Structures are given as C-alpha cells and as structure tokens.
Amino acid sequence: MEKGYSKWRKLDNAALAFPLVTDKNDTRVFRFYCQLKEDVNSAVLQLALDQTMEKYPLFQAVLRKGLFWFYLEHRDIRAVVKPETEPPCSRLYIPDKKSLLFQASYDKNRINFEVFHALTDGTGAMHFLQELVQDYLILAHPQADLPQIEHAEEITHGDKEEDSFSQYYSSDIPKDKEKKKAAVKLKGEKLVHSDMHITEV
C-alpha cells in the first residue's frame, strides 16, 4: 500500500448511516458509466484498473464493524473487471463478507463503475471513473497522444482521509427559516418491496 495511508480508518460522519440501513432491496450503491465509440477490451480494462488502483489505495478496503463504529480496513484484494451480468446497482456490501465496496464492469462499449456510498461520494467516484477511462484509452491507443486529465487541485493524502462533515458542520450556525417548497412526488405504481427500477434514456 502507498506510503502515507493507514491500514484502517473510521467512516466519516456522513457515511455512518449507510451500513446500518442497507439491505438487498436498498443497496445504497450508485453508478457512473462512460460510453465509448468502440467495444471495451476486457484485458486492457483490467490493466487500466490495476493502474488506477495505485492512485486510489483507500478504495482497496473492506467494511468492518468494531465495538463502537464501522471502519474501513485495507486488504490485499485485487479489484477484478467483470462483464455486466447483474442488475444495475446490485448489492456490494454484505455484512461479514470481506469484499471490496466497488465494482468495475463493462458491457459492449460501456465502462461501468458502481460503488457503495459509504466508500466515497459522487465526486470521488467521478474522479475514479475519469482516471480509469483515461488509463484505459492510453493503454488501448498508445500512439494517440491523448491529453491527461487536469484536476483543479492536487489531492493530498490528508484530503482523501479528511472527514469534511466534522470539519465544516457546526450546530451554532443558525438554520435558514425560509419556507421550503414541497418536493416533487413521482406518480405511478410502486414496485413490490420498494424495489428499484432503472430506465435509461
């Protein structure tokens, strides 16, 4: 594991609820994907994932339950690319199962990245997918002289382990008294057990 990272870390405050409320009907998994102009080469995608994981060592972790809190523990488990066979956002975290909390998969010309929400938020997942796709395209087209992804700021080890909720939240800040508009409620027949249904357009 890259120097500068601990072998375990507590979940930040914003992520603590996810392990408690997840089940087979509410997986707390979300997905980003990138659609290419060509079919995905699975062998090249695996090499790209290996490279990307070197930049994201915190993702090589399993979720464990301690006496007082959940925590992420580093494990030498290789992330393996798979063809897409399961429904989108299928369950990734199963209590007491020592498995990674994300999955990279592919289907025809699409690269999928699914992640359990306790591991990272949308920003972290988007950065990971950007790196993965960049590494894939560079490996697949070595003569193309493709541009590198430019991030606004270089992310340090401390930034990746930072609990932003604790750093920026304060109960002393007065709440906004402005009346909020009612949320939009979707119409239609509900699925049995509140199962998820996904429609792509």
Where are these regions (language model features)?
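Non-catalytic N-terminal regions of enzymes
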Residues: 1-167
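Flexible, P/S/T/G-rich "lid" or insertion loops adjacent to the active sites of thioester-utilizing
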Residues: 165-201
